Design a protein with these regions (language model features):
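Charged, low-complexity intrinsically disordered terminal segments
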Residues: 2-134, 142-156, 160-408
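A short acidic/basic microdomain associated with nuclease active sites
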Residues: 138
Length: 408
C-alpha cells in the first residue's frame, strides 16, 4: 500500500514539475516575442525640474491619516491609483471614502493594477461605479502576448487631489501597510507628499496611464504651478534600458558614497551592476540596505548570489531587523536623492511601469539623510558566513529562486 502511495506521489510530482517547466518555457518564448514586437515598448516620461514642498512619510498610519484627510477635503477631483489593495477594514474605509466623495459631487477616478488588485471584490467594484466613481484596472492581460502582459504591471502609486496635492511612493492600501499584520510586523516604507509645481506632472502621468487603459474620458485639469522650496524631477518608466541608463549615470557621478534602500536586492541588470562595481573601484563607499523579512516569496533567497558578489566587491550589505522595509530610495554623496516606486530587482528594472522622484536639493536631502541613517542603525550588517553557511532548505530555495529571479 505504501509503495503504491509513493508511486502515485512521485507521478504527481513529476507531472507538477513538467507543467511548471512547460509554463516557464512558454512564458520565456512569449516574453521574447513580445519584446521583439515592441508591444510593451514606450519611451519614458521625463518631466522638467520643478519646485515643490515635499514631505516624506515612513509610517503607514501617519500616511493614511494625511491622505484620507486630504481626500476628505477635496472639492473638485481626486485621481488615485495603487499597485494593490487588500480586502480588509482599511481598504473598505478607503473605498467608502471614494464613494462618499463621489456622492458629494467630486470627480473621483480610481485605478488599480489588474493583478495587484486581484483581491478587490466584484461587489466593491460595482458599488464604486454605482456611486459615480470612475474605475478601471491597469494593464489587463491581453492576447496574443498573455504571459508577457501578465508580467507587465503598473507599479506606480499616484494620488492627486484638486491639483494641489500629490502623493507617490511605496505604500499600498491595506492593514499590513499599517503594521497590523502579526506575521509581518512593523512596516517601514517611503512615500512622498508633493505640494507645488510637481503635482502637475503626477496628474499628467495619471491621465496618460488612464487613457492607456480605459476608454472612459478623463479631463485634464489645470494643476497648481505655485513653486515650493525643493528642486526635483519626476521620471516615469515603462520598462527597458532607460532606467538602467539613469541609475548608472548617477552612480558614475558618485565620489564618496552610494546608499541604496530596497526591499529586494536582485540587481540582474549589467548596466546598473557594472556602475556600482566601477564606483567601488574608484573608492566610493557603497551601502545596500534590504529587507530579509518580506511579504514576497523567495526574494531573500534570490538575493543571496548578489549579496555574495557585492561583498566580494567590498560593498557593505545590511539587513533590516525591525520588520519589513519596503522603501525604495538611493542617496549619492548627499547631493542626489531618489525616492520612488522602483525596487532594486529585475521586475522593476525591466517589466514594471514605475515612477521616481529625483531630488537635487541639499537642504531637503539633509533632512532625509537622518531617516536613512536610522534605518541603517536598525539593521544588521551581513557577512559572508551569513550567505555561505546555509541550511539544505535554504540552498534548495536559492536554486529555485535562481530559476525565477527575473520575475520575482
Amino acid at each position: 500500500m505504501l509503495k503504491k502511495i509513493g508511486k502515485i506521489f512521485r507521478l504527481l510530482l513529476f507531472v507538477f514539475i513538467g507543467i511548471c517547466l512547460v509554463l516557464f518555457v512558454w512564458g520565456e518564448i512569449d516574453r521574447t516575442v513580445a519584446e521583439k514586437s515592441g508591444r510593451f515598448a514606450h519611451q519614458p516620461s521625463q518631466y522638467p525640474i520643478r519646485q515643490s514642498d515635499i514631505t516624506m512619510y515612513t509610517d503607514g498610519k501617519q500616511l493614511n491619516n494625511q491622505l484620507f484627510s486630504d481626500i476628505k477635503k477635496a472639492k473638485d477631483y481626486v485621481h488615485i491609483s495603487f499597485f494593490s489593495i487588500a480586502d480588509d477594514k482599511v481598504s473598505h474605509q478607503f473605498l467608502d471614502l471614494l464613494r462618499q466623495k463621489s456622492q458629494e459631487g467630486v470627480e473621483v477616478y480610481y485605478a488599480v493594477d489588474r493583478l495587484g488588485g486581484i483581491l478587490l471584490k466584484k461587489k466593491e467594484r460595482e458599488l464604486l461605479v454605482k456611486k459615480g466613481v470612475h474605475f478601471t484596472y491597469y494593464n489587463k492581460p491581453v492576447f496574443p502576448y498573455l504571459s508577457a502582459s501578465l508580467d507587465h504591471r503598473n507599479h506606480r502609486r499616484i494620488s492627486v487631489i484638486d491639483g494641489r496635492i500629490g502623493y507617490i511612493g511605496g505604500f499600498n492600501i491595506g492593514k499590513k501597510y499599517l503594521g497590523e499584520k502579526a506575521k509581518l510586523g512593523h512596516w517601514r516604507d517611503y512615500h512622498l507628499q508633493i505640494r507645488g509645481e510637481g503635482v502637475q506632472d503626477l496628474e499628467n502621468q495619471f491621465v496618460l496611464d488612464w487613457k492607456k487603459n480605459s476608454e472612459k474620458p478623463i479631463p485634464i485639469h489645470s494643476a497648481t504651478k505655485e513653486k515650493g522650496k525643493t528642486s526635483h524631477r519626476f521620471t516615469a518608466y515603462y520598462s527597458g534600458e532607460k532606467l538602467g541608463q539613469d541609475y548608472a549615470g548617477l552612480f558614475q557621478q558618485a565620489k564618496e558614497s552610494i546608499i541604496i534602500v530596497t526591499p529586494y536586492f536582485i540587481p540582474k541588470d549589467k548596466t546598473i551592476w557594472n556602475a556600482l562595481v566601477d564606483a567601488r573601484k574608484r573608492g566610493v563607499r557603497v551601502k545596500i540596505l534590504f529587507s530579509p523579512h518580506s511579504d514576497a516569496l523567495l526574494v531573500k533567497e534570490a538575493a543571496y548570489p548578489y549579496i555574495r558578489k557585492a561583498l566580494k566587491q567590498g560593498m557593505e550589505v545590511y539587513g533590516y531587523k525591525e520588520g519589513v522595509l519596503h522603501g525604495k530610495a538611493f542617496l549619492i554623496d548627499e547631493n542626489v536623492l531618489m525616492v520612488g516606486t522602483v525596487n532594486f530587482d529585475s521586475r522593476s528594472f525591466h517589466l514594471n511601469e514605475e515612477m521616481n522622484c529625483y531630488i537635487h536639493d541639499p537642504v531637503y536631502i539633509s533632512k532625509i539623510k537622518p531617516v536613512i541613517d536610522v534605518d541603517l542603525q536598525n539593521s544588521k550588517r551581513v557577512t559572508s558566513s551569513d550567505v555561505n553557511q546555509l541550511s539544505i532548505k535554504e540552498k534548495v530555495k536559492e536554486k529555485v529562486a535562481k530559476i525565477f529571479e527575473y520575475y520575482l
